[in-house]
């Protein structure tokens, strides 16, 4: 049995993807028999500390100023005495403009000499493409701030979600390895009866936020052509919040609704999402291929062993095109092999499996090194 402390910005339910990630990881580590302390450093209301699989308790004040909050965290860490601290980092969660200048110093002060694993969910802006001068300067400052973070926290290991980030960190002298994201949708073997009833349709699914830069064309035209070739109608559903991509969805419906049946189902419980994934023929990812590994929604579809169509293949700015980690999932690109890949995966049996248990075991393995 090990003791793990997980530090992140927020642990409230539905606050953001990293909060979901941290809570699920803590629960899985506890399921595997370990004791876990989970702390939301920046959380200003609600329960910002949780214990898993332990009798530890803490009296908390969510309205503390930052110095008082740090001292309370230091006391909690000292009392819990973890063998490893896992820091789940996103720059914009810890400071205005994504520049938390002293966060590394503060983290190292509260954990003392405990070994630390850094999971960098985001690095800095301007990664996917060049930007205007103001954004470029912000990204440059964030990169310098990240270098300082590494110097201050002295991590035992650094994890990222995708190979593009590994290359970016190599360029600043940091050795990192890929720890694949797990989805926040528990994997089931249930198929949604409503979606399954459309047996004469080719059923595609978009889950969660739609990237505002994603373009439905020419994918929609190719899908219509493929559906016609196998004598099926075409159906696209959206499950969950579309985020900043609501206008993309609305414009897509306006343009293609004469040839495609669209259904925006909105938010729903995780069990229904899993059932829809099991009933859909394909998933559609709106993130670029180079950064697909950092998409939690893509991770959920891939854990359900869905063939996932990726239309964006622009290079990752400054490191070029980067392929996903080997064996990460079944992808269909919008290239000359599109129809062949669509036919190959249609109706194939699936081997659904959550990555969460493997990720938790990898965290424990750090203690063994």
Positions of the model-derived regions?
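N-terminal strand-loop element at the rim of the active site
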Residues: 8-13, 24-80, 241-245
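A charged, aromatic-enriched C-terminal amphipathic alpha-helix characteristic of glycosyltransferases
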Residues: 32, 335-369
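Membrane-proximal helix-turn-helix segments that form the acceptor-binding/catalytic region
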Residues: 105-112, 135-157
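Nucleotide-sugar donor phosphate/pyrophosphate-binding loop at the beta->alpha transition
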Residues: 117, 125-149, 164, 185-189
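Donor nucleotide-sugar binding/catalytic pocket of nucleotide-sugar-dependent glycosyltransferases
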Residues: 148-207
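Conserved catalytic-core segment of nucleotide-activated headgroup transferases in glycan assembly
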Residues: 185-187, 192, 196-251
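Nucleotide-activated donor-binding/catalytic signature segment of Leloir-type glycosyltransferases, i.e.
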Residues: 248-271
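Acidic donor-binding loop of glycosyltransferase active sites
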Residues: 277-292
């Amino acid at each position: 049995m090990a003791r793990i402390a997980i530090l992140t910005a927020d642990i409230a339910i539905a606050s953001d993807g990293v909060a979901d990630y941290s809570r699920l990881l803590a629960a899985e580590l506890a399921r595997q028999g370990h004791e876990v302390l989970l702390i939301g450093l920046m959380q200003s209301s609600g329960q910002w500390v949780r214990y898993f699989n332990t009798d530890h308790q803490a009296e908390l004040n969510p309205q503390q100023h930052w110095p008082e909050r740090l001292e309370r965290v230091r006391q909690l860490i000292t009392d819990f005495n973890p063998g490893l601290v896992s820091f789940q980092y996103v720059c914009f969660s810890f400071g205005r403009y994504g520049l938390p200048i002293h966060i590394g110093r503060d983290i190292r002060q509260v954990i003392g000499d405990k070994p630390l694993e850094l999971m960098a969910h985001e690095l800095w802006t301007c990664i996917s493409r060049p930007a205007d001068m103001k954004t470029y300067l912000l990204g440059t400052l964030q990169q310098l701030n990240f270098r300082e973070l590494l110097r201050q926290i002295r991590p035992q290991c650094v994890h990222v979600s995708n190979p593009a980030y590994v290359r970016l960190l190599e360029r600043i002298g940091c050795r990192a390895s890929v720890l694949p994201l797990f989805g926040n949708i528990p994997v089931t073997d249930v198929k949604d009866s409503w979606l399954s009833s459309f047996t004469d349709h080719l059923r595609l699914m978009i889950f969660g936020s739609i990237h505002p830069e994603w373009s439905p064309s020419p994918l929609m035209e190719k899908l219509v052509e493929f559906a016609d070739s196998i004598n099926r109608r075409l159906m696209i559903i959206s499950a969950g919040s579309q985020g900043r991509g609501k206008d993309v969805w609305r414009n897509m419906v306006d343009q293609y609704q004469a040839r495609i049946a669209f259904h925006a189902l909105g938010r729903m419980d995780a069990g229904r999402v899993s059932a829809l994934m099991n009933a859909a023929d394909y998933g559609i990812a709106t993130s670029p291929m180079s950064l697909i590994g950092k998409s939690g929604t893509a991770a959920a579809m891939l854990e359900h062993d869905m063939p996932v169509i990726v239309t964006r293949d622009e290079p990752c700015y400054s490191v070029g095109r980067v392929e996903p980690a080997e064996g990460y999932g079944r992808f269909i690109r919008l290239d000359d092999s599109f129809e062949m890949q669509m036919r190959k995966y249609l109706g194939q049996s699936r081997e659904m499996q959550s990555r969460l248990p493997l990720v938790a075991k990898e965290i424990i393995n750090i203690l063994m090194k």
